[in-house]
Amino acid sequence: MKRFLTRTLPCLTGLSTVLIVLGMMMWRYLDEPTVLPLLTSSHEDLAGEIALVNAAFARAQTTPPLSSVPAADALTLARRLSLSLTGAPPSLEEIRRLEALPAGADPVNAWLDHLFADRRYADYLAERFARAFVGVETGPFLVYRRRRLVTWLGDQIAINRPYDELVRQLISAEGLWTSHPEANFITVSVVAGGGGPDETKLAARTARAFLGVSLDCMQCHDDKFSDRWKQKDFHQLAAFFAQADTTITGVREKRTKDYEARYLGEKSGTKIAPQVPFLPELFAAGGSRREQLARWITHPENTAFARVTVNRTWAILFGRPLSEPVDDIPLEGPYPTGLEELAHGFIASGYDMERLIRVIAGSDPFRRESRSVDPDKPVTAEQESTWAAFPVTPLRPEQVAGSVIQASTLQALDGSTHIIQKLRRYGETRDFVKRYGDRGEDEFAEESGTIPQRLLLMNGKLVNERTKPNPVMNSSTRLAHYAPSDAKTLDAAFLALLSRYPTNPEREHFTRLLEGKEKKARERAMADLYWSLINSTEFSWNR
């Protein structure tokens, strides 16, 4: 077949040539050829740390027995990782590479090797963390500055820069927001219409994002529910940002500037000196106020910094944090199972983000199925709450869009994708999320699907454009033309859409839909199949 296509290609022009090329490309994935396997590397040094984490969860999982929830297969694990770390499921091209792994290779670490080398991972993780750092506020200047910051974050994540270094540079950044994008952590808080950065906004974000402490309400009064936090804790933290000033040369330190605030019950404001809200023995003088704060936050003995980072990373991988809310963790505990083991391992690794992801993905909770093997004994709420089964959670809006877009293209839409395809994907994702509804900063709050969301998947522009008969742009039509058999067609469609093979009942049902149909009728049948699977519950959930 390949030899025939190669000899015929020079004789054709125009659309015929394009279709032949697409057929040649698809044949690689439909006929299950020998595909270059993923690079595999040994990560035996992780075994001890993963064992500590697994032991902690085993102690907490007393009932029901763990044997009722088996280990997930390689395709399920790859789908979880791709959705969590790139915002889209694996392509059929990538799945064939996964299936070509040598026997005995660990699919999780092999897949992570693949994802960490893909710029999609860095860009997507940067966007997820940017929500905690600077929120999702809009406006022409804010959007551009935020985008510059996200790009910078992606550059740091791509080289696996130690997370503590990254955060120190964010908090203490100086310079123009164009040439020093990290300074946009400060500039996005600049009050509209002039003025310097908003110290209170920076204090609130810093406390939540880097300490896992909710001090927002303490801006106006002491904590009404405990004696732990006082109004002074908030304003003394805000005072660290008072000397950050914005000028024509960008963010600079204005050492003579003081911070003033009015405490509850007082008639006038007062000057407030900076002071950390806990663990003052870790604080060291020297440098600007923001440099001092950054060193204290990332001090190895300030475990709060590691805890909130671990909690957010866990939530990105599972769709649900260990401790809820994700950015409000009690300083003195008690802590949820696994959090302390992961936090101390993160610190010991030198705040290695890729290693943290490998440890979490290598743990028993991540590698388990989300369903019981016994249909008469389904997974219980207790099993999910103790992580004895993988929690089933709805996909985020951009993950739903990414799934539709990737499923319609059998090749991976990765960092090497042509700029035209990238721009199309960006525009389609932006429009879909706008209509589907962005979760905003509170991205891990439990939400149920809405009727408008279901209607958007049923009748929306993205699904229609990506499933309708189109031999150049859509995989549904290309499968209808080039797959050598109905069985191969169904295998490819299910792998592209759901990252699994069809069950026997599914195969029987959809074979009847396809058998005997040719050309236009087969194109329409494949479009219907794609539409049906996109509108299935399984498509829009992480399992």
Q: Each predicted region: which residue ranges?
A:
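Short, structured secondary-structure elements
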Residues: 16, 23-270, 274, 305-343, ...
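Hydrophobic helix-coil surface modules that form long, contiguous segments used
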Residues: 279-282, 291-294, 454, 473
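Conserved micro-motifs of the catalytic ATP-binding
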Residues: 499
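Internal "kinase-insert"/substrate-recognition segments embedded within catalytic cores
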Residues: 271-285
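Structured secondary-structure scaffolds
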Residues: 283-287, 292-305, 309, 313-317
